[in-house]
Amino acid sequence: MPPTAVTEATAVPGSNVTTKDPAKDTILTPRFYTTDFEAMAAMDLRPNEAELEAICEEFRKDYNRHHFVRNGEFDGAADQLDPETRKVFVEFLEQSCTSEFSGFLLYKELSRRIKTKNPLLAECFSHMARDEARHAGFLNKSMSDFGLQLDLGFLTSSKSYTFFKPKFIFYATYLSEKIGYWRYITIFRHLEQNPDSKIFPIFNFFENWCQDENRHGDFFDALMKAQPETVRGLRARLWCRFFLLAVFATMYVRDVARKEFYEALGLDAREYDRLVIDKTNENTARVFPVVLDVKNPRFYNGLERLVNNNAALSAVDATQAPAPIKLLRKLPHWVANGAQMASLFLMAPIRSDRYHPSVR
């Protein structure tokens, strides 16, 4: 179930802004990660050091240093939204801010913990933390236009952290950054052609914004190539398939569940996600050894079954039944989700050298 804008909030003394409690954690909300810092510090970058140094030089230029500056278009823009659009847009801001802030925390901690042992890697993470903090702050400032803001300090201490081995961090964050690029640029291009659907001026910033996401994805691409065991062999192929499926399925189920936001922009959530998935899958073939067969009708048929199961789970949550009864009612839907994910995972993947031969 996606996060909602209706959570507890507390007023900030002497301010018109209310501090909003974080949305309840679910399988669809952004995760906070930690990893093995010693293993990261010990990584040998020499197999692809030249490319990593070139990417770090790009980070140093900080192309968007002066991009995230609010202008007069924000004045009164929040008051122009009807209540339903306002609600779904605040949900979008909250989820996006949380996601960007989780990236900041991970990258910042990595840069701090490996600085002395792996300075090039630490510097890259420091630059990416700068970008993510800038994004999160800009989103949180937009929330204040609606009289709300996230307490990012409280978020840091209250969220549970998921431990991932470094290679799993690489898979997950690479996909997150590349998906972020395609999500932002797709919305920007659509609103360029349909300016009447631009419900808030923050979307004017998405063209440059998405380039940060793209550069971050390129960094993880280069880092995996410096650690070739992450993208070679049977285990790597299986893990790449797993992360592709997990990330695509989560995004699709979440976006269809909150399709009203995309409708407010004049987009169809399903069509939007299909484009983002297709483009990300294509990008992923540049580094992953296999990609998913997203053109196979079975793929989206399976995702639709997950959507239906998620809707059924949300319906159970909305009832007044006692917790044990809810648990029993949810059980068959959880089992069905697990079986469907297994079926999708077992679909034959496409070898990247066959899917995208021009880049191998």
Curated annotation (Swiss-Prot):
Catalyzes the formation of the isocyclic ring in chlorophyll biosynthesis. Mediates the cyclase reaction, which results in the formation of divinylprotochlorophyllide (Pchlide) characteristic of all chlorophylls from magnesium-protoporphyrin IX 13-monomethyl ester (MgPMME). It comes from Synechococcus sp. (strain CC9311). Its cofactor is Fe cation. GO terms for molecular function: iron ion binding; magnesium-protoporphyrin IX monomethyl ester (oxidative) cyclase activity. Belongs to the AcsF family. It catalyses: Mg-protoporphyrin IX 13-monomethyl ester + 3 NADPH + 3 O2 + 2 H(+) = 3,8-divinyl protochlorophyllide a + 3 NADP(+) + 5 H2O. This is Magnesium-protoporphyrin IX monomethyl ester [oxidative] cyclase. Keywords: Chlorophyll biosynthesis, Iron, Metal-binding, NADP, Oxidoreductase, Photosynthesis. CDD domains: ACSF. Its EC number is 1.14.13.81. SUPFAM superfamilies: Ferritin-like (SSF47240). InterPro entries: AcsF, Ferritin-like_SF, Rr_diiron-bd_dom. Residues 1-21 are annotated as: Disordered. Pathway: Porphyrin-containing compound metabolism; chlorophyll biosynthesis (light-independent). The gene is acsF. GO terms for biological process: light-independent chlorophyll biosynthetic process; photosynthesis.
